[in-house]
A protein has these predicted regions:
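Intrinsically disordered, low-complexity arginine-rich tails of RNA-binding/processing proteins
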Residues: 16, 21-47
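Generic helix N-cap/helix-start motif at coil->alpha-helix transitions
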Residues: 64-71, 93-104, 128-137, 169-180, ...
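Amphipathic alpha-helical scaffolding segments comprising HEAT/armadillo-like alpha-solenoid repeats
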Residues: 80-92, 113-126, 146-167, 189-201, ...
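N-terminal alpha-helical scaffold/docking segments in eukaryotic complex subunits
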Residues: 46-118, 304-307, 316-336
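Extended alpha-helical scaffolding segments
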Residues: 253, 269-336
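Surface-facing alpha-helical segments and adjacent helix-coil boundary elements at the starts of domains
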Residues: 94-97, 107-146, 153, 160-161, ...
Length: 339
């Protein structure tokens, strides 16, 4: 189907996110065009007439844009046809049962809907797309604030969804993992303790679950303490384990370096936050030594900066890291009563 792209002085083509997160779709309208595009006259009256016509044109185009946006909400152009059929059935059932007017997937991702959790639980495994599945799991967890109850057995449902995703890909997508991290952290379910600790034992996955890891540390389970202490005491071994977890993907140097960087900037600082829940003199000494090394590393990088902006960026990066380290030091000192 031929589409005409609206541009010129009526405004640039509207851009709208597709129903699938993170995949922008440029909005194109069929048959929408400016009327009365003749040459402007030199008379004052002609200019007023042309301004009125332009104003009418803009209203016409805006109405077409709204119509097409509604169409995009109902038909996700980047969804597989099978998933689209399932989505249509899911939305129809939610609208009829919960007495709401959900137009499409984007609406479903943006709102808690009272009574929708059990309906979504019935359909969620039917979707082929793990992106769609992950975007809907928050409905299973529910929300007291929005009077949305938790689906019975949702802990195991969500764990199975995550596990199926993890086993289907060589390396994971951050946006999908964020949804599962949020879900596990909100569940706060000790029914999943063993599974989540096993997840924590893989440093590659550890970096993707900061909220969940902090929750496990707060529970002060001995098995989690062993994981945290191991990561902090053996940083070199961590990167070996990351490479092993990636398997063949580790043969790609760019992928391996990306995951090493993720650990350096995220994983190890989640470890440092978790250490607050396992206070000891030994941990305190190691943290203070790590603080000194971080300051030294910052000074080395600052000395290599060629511009003022580079120095600002380096200071911003290291100030966040030092804040995390120093807060953990302070918390441990309080618990040891040595402030």
């Amino acid at each position: 189907m031929t589409m005409s792209l609206i541009s010129d002085e009526l405004g640039q083509a509207s851009t709208k996110k597709s129903s699938v997160k993170g995949q922008p779709v440029v909005l194109r309208l069929q048959g929408a065009h400016r009327r009365g595009c003749g040459q402007r006259t030199g008379s004052h009256g002609g200019n007023n007439s042309r301004q009125q016509e332009d104003s009418m044109d803009k209203h016409f185009v805006l109405s077409k844009i709204k119509d097409y946006e509604a169409h995009l909400d109902n038909v996700a152009p980047l969804m597989e046809s099978d998933d689209q059929l399932i989505m249509n059935e899911l939305i129809r059932e939610i609208n009829n049962t919960c007495h709401v007017k959900i137009r499409g997937f984007s609406d479903l991702c943006d709102s808690y809907i009272k009574g929708a959790g059990s309906i979504i639980a019935k359909h969620i495994n039917c979707f082929h797309s793990h992106l769609i599945r992950s975007a809907l799991v928050f409905h299973l967890v529910g929300s007291k604030k929005h009077e949305c109850g938790r689906v019975n057995g949702c802990e195991q449902i969500i764990w199975n969804l995550y596990n199926e995703y993890r086993n289907s890909v060589p390396f994971v997508d951050n946006s999908i993992m964020m949804e599962y991290d949020s879900a596990f952290a909100q569940l706060k379910s000790k029914k999943l303790l063993d599974q989540l600790v096993s997840l924590a034992q893989d440093p590659y996955l550890f970096s993707f679950f900061p909220q969940t890891m902090k929750m496990l540390a707060r529970w002060r389970d001995p098995s989690m303490e062993k994981v945290i202490m191991g990561y902090f005491a053996n940083p070199g071994l961590v990167k070996t384990q990351i490479a092993m977890s990636l398997g063949r993907s580790a043969d790609d140097a760019s992928i391996l370096q990306r995951e090493y960087s993720r650990w350096d900037s995220h994983g190890q600082y989640t470890v440092i936050i978790c250490l607050r829940y396992y206070p000891s003199i030994q941990v305190l000494d190691k943290l203070m030594h790590f603080e000194a090394l971080t300051v030294e590393d910052m000074e080395k990088n600052l000395s290599k900066c060629c511009t003022h902006n580079d120095r600002i960026w380096i200071k911003d990066v290291y100030s966040d890291r030092l804040f995390t380290i120093r807060k953990s030091i302070t918390e441990i000192k309080k618990q040891l009563d040595i402030l």
